[in-house]
Structures are given as structure tokens and as C-alpha cells.
Amino acid sequence: MEFSTKTEILQEQQAGAQLFVCTEEAQLNHPTALALLSSLEEGQNFADTKIPTGNGLQAVAVCCLKSTGRAALNKAAAEAAKWAQNQETVNVDVHAFEEAQAAAVAEAFAIAFGNAAYRFDRYKKEAKPAKFAEAVFHSAHEAAVKEALRVAEAQVYGQSLCRDLGNAAPNECTPEFLARTAKAEAEKLGAHAKIIEKDYIKENMGSFWSVAKGSVEDPYLVELSYFGAADKEAAPVVLVGKGITFDTGGISLKPGLNMDEMKFDMCGAATVISTFCAAVKLQLPINLIAVVATCENMPSGAANKPGDVVKSMKGLTIEVLNTDAEGRLILCDALTYAEQFKPKAVIDVATLTGACIVALGHDVSGVMGNNQDLVDSLLAASYNVDDKAWQLPLFETYKDQLKSNFADIPNIGTPGAGTITAATFLSYFTEGYPWAHLDIAGTAWKSGAEKGATGRPVPLLLNYLRNL
């Protein structure tokens, strides 16, 4: 998908499909668009038609915005994107808006167009590429719109990378594949990448290794780094991602129904890799590090057993009461590893608990943390781009649900508040820095007819990083 800008006002008979984005009060200098705007009934905000030209029929559409809030923008843009899929090139006129609004409209519509054009068909014999290939935005505020399109392009790139990684089959997207892809993508953008292999993990990260040793696939720890701040020594933001490339549940085996979707259990890692790369693509003036722990969770003679006690990198011992609560076992060591960077903030991202879906459904990510300013910044970013998230509490009393007779802590709590007790477990390993946890179990992918990775919460995290 290509985006570009022009300052000219669209006229009748001009080549290419035409989309006018405006308000109800807009004075459109285009008879067909004006007629479409006048035809909108109560509750409608989109109308389209085709008009004859010397080269055949031309598609013309109007999208009338009742609000320029991001949620309303995203909804309107998604509707327009469905129409745009049938065009090759769409000219989008946003002359009805002043500079800031024109930029916001262009960004939202470009992101919707880019995401709608996404295809994942590399395993199919006959691929069907998207017809829609180019969007040209027309505005008097060309510089502001051009910058908005630069941001949109980076977000679409990040979400598409995240979706590609999530959608990849688990026999292709092994821990090694995920690690090598992260390294290659980061280095292509000029960032530094380091892959840490099995021997280090086995020797230093006992909790992580306890999960990984059940699989024939080796585990990897990936470290990506980018120093874009004027002060290269300034404390970085560290993103930490859970990369379980397939989760059977281990000895505590999951039910067979829908187990194929457990290839998406690495979407936290995919989000972290993709957000990092999008931030580097934008050349944000920040110092940023991404840490990804990746392995499989498989049942075997070498796998964790319920009742096993393992020692974390921090030194705390963990009683494994359920081998299907493995994400926190690899994350806790990755979070301890992050301490060495003396971070400004650490944000971990994980498809951690089914309980989060019970609490918040499939449209809202859960946010928890030990620093309210950091949590508030993430919630603000969520609102800015309409990538919904909601804070859950982390009261000290939840630690009462994490008691073990045989180790320092168990890997699951007593029944109730499963999302919170999982985050409470992680909080034992994040005492040395400001930390927030994003549980994306409900938002990272869709099931059913639209099955596939969503690329969320890349929009939220990228907006957070842009506003540092």
C-alpha cells in the first residue's frame, strides 16, 4: 500500500476513485459528492455511486464525520476501507478540515486502508493480492498530512509484521524462526540485535528453561536495541514479550478443541518485535530495547510436571502447580534479565490468561502495573488510537492467593481473579523498576470466520512511545 499527498481539490472527471471525507456543514465543490452528502439519512455517514466519464464509470463516495474523535474516525475509516478494496487507486479529499484535524483524519483513514489491504496467503496455491494499492490524500495542509501518513505507514508496517508472525503456522514459526526473523527485521532497519541460545538459558534462567526443556525445539532469548535519544546513555524503555510459539499446555494438557489457535500464544513477542521495528522505522528520539523469550510448551518425558520446583533467574523458587501457566515462567526470567538495562520503564506483553477474556472480552486488553504514571500513559495511548485497554487492580492482598508450602511462590494462585494473580506473580520480578503488564489474551487474535492475528496492541504501544 502506497500513500502520497497532493494539495489540489478534487474535481469531477478527475482520474481515479474519489472519496470525500467531510462534516455535515462542508461546502463541497463537487456536484456528485454534494448530492451524496445531501442524500445521507439520519444515522448514515457513508454513501457512494458511480458516474460516467470518458474512461468508463468512476467511483465516488462521501464519508460524513459526526465526530473527529479517534473511535468515530476509526469506525468511519473502516467503512470507507471496505468500499476502497474494490478500487486500485483512491483519491481522498480532506480539504474540509483544518490542519490538525486533516492530519488526524488522514492518519486514521490510511491505517484503515493499509490494514484492510492486508493478506496472509503464502501457504495457498493461488494467492489473491489486494486490488487496492494506492491512496492519495488531498489537503491544503500537505506537510501535516504527509507526517500523519508517515506515522500511518509505520503503524501499518508494524501491525502487518505482527500479523504475519502470528498467522504463521507453528511448524514454520518455531522459536528459532521467530528469533531469526526478529534479528533480521531489526538489522534491516539499522538496529542492533542479539540472539542468546540454549546454553545461557539453561545455566542462568531456570524457570524459562523448565518450560523449554520439554520440546525438541531449542529456546531463544532475543535482545533488540535502538538508541535514538540525543543522550545515548539515557535510561531506555524496555518491552518484554512472551513468545510461546505453540502451547499444548504441557503435561497439564489443553483440550483438543481449538488447540490450533495456540500458535497465537507468541503474539506478545510478535507485538514487541513489531512495535520495536515500527519505532525504529519512525526514528523516534528514544532509547528502546526489546526482550523476547521464546520456546514451545510441549508434553514429553523431559517436560515440567505439576509439583516440580524450579529456580528463577532472580533466585526465587517456583512450585509448578499447572504446566499450562507457562507464560509467566518464561516472562519472569525475561523481566529479571531486563534489570541490567536500568530501565526508565518496562512493559511486558503476553497472551497470559483466559481469565482476561472472561473479565474484559475480546475487544479490551488488560493493564496492570506497579507505577500508576506508567499505567496512565498506556491508558492515554489506548484512548488516543482507540486500541482499547482497561486497568485491573494489583492490591497487595492478591499476594495472599500465591502461597506455597514447598517454594517461595507457586505459578498459579487460588481460584478467582486469575488475570490479576498472574500479574501479581510477575510483580515479584519487577520490583526494581516502573513496570506495566498488558494481558492481550482476548485481543491478539480473532477466531471463527475472521480467524487470524489482529496486530494489537501495536497501535497502543507505538502511540505510547511516540508521546514519550
Swiss-Prot record:
Cofactor note (record): Binds 2 manganese ions per subunit.
| Gene assigned in the entry | pepA
Tell me which GO cellular component terms the UniProt record holds.
Answer: cytoplasm
What's the cofactor? Mn(2+)
Q: Which GO terms describe its biological process?
A: proteolysis
> Which molecular function GO terms apply here?
manganese ion binding; metalloaminopeptidase activity
The organism's place on the tree of life at top rank? Bacteria
- List the InterPro entries: Leucine_aapep/pepB, Macro_dom-like, Peptidase_M17_C, Peptidase_M17_leu_NH2_pept
Name the chemical reaction catalysed here.
Release of an N-terminal amino acid, Xaa-|-Yaa-, in which Xaa is preferably Leu, but may be other amino acids including Pro although not Arg or Lys, and Yaa may be Pro. Amino acid amides and methyl esters are also readily hydrolyzed, but rates on arylamides are exceedingly low; Release of an N-terminal amino acid, preferentially leucine, but not glutamic or aspartic acids
Stated EC number for the protein is: 3.4.11.1, 3.4.11.10
Q: Which CDD domains match?
A: Peptidase_M17
**What family does this belong to?**
Belongs to the peptidase M17 family.
Protein name as catalogued = Probable cytosol aminopeptidase
List localization entries.
Cytoplasm
Q: Which organism is it from?
A: Neisseria meningitidis serogroup A / serotype 4A (strain DSM 15465 / Z2491)
Catalytic class of the enzyme: hydrolase
Pfam families named in the record: Peptidase_M17 (PF00883)
